[in-house]
Amino acid sequence: WFAQGQYTRPQSLQYGGDTLQQGPKMILDWLKKNLNNTKKVFGIDLHTGLGKSGYDTILVPDDIKEDKYNILVSLFGDHVSPLDPTQGVGYRITGDIHSGIVKEFSSIEWLTITQEFGTFGPTTVFKNLRAENRWTQNNQLTNEKDIMNHWSRKNLLNTFNPNNKRWQQDLISRGNTVFKSVQEYLSKLD
C-alpha cells in the first residue's frame, strides 16, 4: 500500500529520510520541554487523504488493548477502525509518530489515535503523489520558489487539503467534535 512511509529507497514515493526529520524533531523538543510532570496524554494525529471524502476515521493500532479500544468506541462510535487494510481505510505500519513518542516518554500513560479525513479516491491520490515525486526527483531548477510552485506540488496540496469549503467545514466541525470529546473524557479522569 503506497500510503505507508518507507526508508530504503530515497527516490521512491513516501521516502521518510534516513534521520529524524525537522517536523518530528520539533514536536519531540516541544514535548520534552512541556511534559515534565504529565502523567496521562491523549494524542490526536490529524491526517488527510484516506477514505470517503469528508468522513473521518479514527485509526488505532492493531495491538491496542481491549479496554482502550472500548474507550475509543464509546467516544467515537463506528468511526473507530484498526490500522488493518482488511477492516477499513487503514494500512499496516511499522513504527509511526505515536510509537516513537510513546517510547520516548515511557513514564506517561498514552492513548493515541490518528484522525484520518478522506479527500479523493486512491487513484487520484496515487496519481498526484507520483507526479509530485517525479517532479521532485527530476527537475533541473535551482530557484526554490520555482520548484515549490510547480503544478504537481499545487495538485498534491489540493489532494490533501481540497479547495472545497464544504470539505473544510466538515474537517473543522468533526475535528472540534473529536477534540471536545477527548477534553470531556480527560476531565472525568481527574
For the regions a language model picked out, list residue spans one by one.
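C-terminal accessory segments enriched in acidic
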Residues: 1-190
